[in-house]
Amino acid sequence: MQDSAKLKVLFIAGFGPIVRDTGESRRLYRDVLGMPFKEEADGYLHSEAVPGAKSFALWPLSQAAQSCFGKDSWPKDIPEPQAWLEFDVDSVEKATAVLESGGYRMLVKNKKEPWGQIVSRFISPEGLLVGISFTPAFREQK
């Protein structure tokens, strides 16, 4: 672990592909690979039952765009991400400031989602939609 880090990642909150064709992705991940997904009314497939991951989800691009920009289409001037990755951190606000001071363009800053998560998002150099978050459900003792 690097001692000079400016922020502390507590754990990987979740990851998965950002999908363009939900049917094809459902067929691969659920039907062929046997992933135990819960399916929401809007077609969002997610699982908190895959060992080694707090959450694995197939996130439709339109839903990622809605979360980041408040509309169903991804902006043409920002590369479309292929996958998402979220890290839970001590302080989303501090982590956001550290990332911005490092030159990262935040797409969303300190947004509170309906399920209680606080998140900031940016595109990584590899083209991933990266979130730094505080996810209360993942912090509760089981």
Regions from the language model: what does each represent?
Residues M1-R26, Q82-F87, S133-K142:
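N-terminal beta-strand motif that seeds the catalytic metal site of vicinal oxygen chelate
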Residues D3, G70-K76:
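Short, P/G- and charge-enriched loop/turn segments at secondary-structure junctions
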Residues G16-Q63:
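Core segments of cupin and vicinal oxygen chelate
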Residues R20-G23, P79-L129:
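Vicinal oxygen chelate
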Residues A65-D72, R139-Q141:
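A short, acidic/glycine-rich surface segment
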Residues W59-P60, R121, I132-R139:
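Short beta->alpha transition motifs characteristic of CBS
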Residues S47-G52, F122-P125, T135:
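Active-site beta-strand termini and strand-to-loop segments that position acidic
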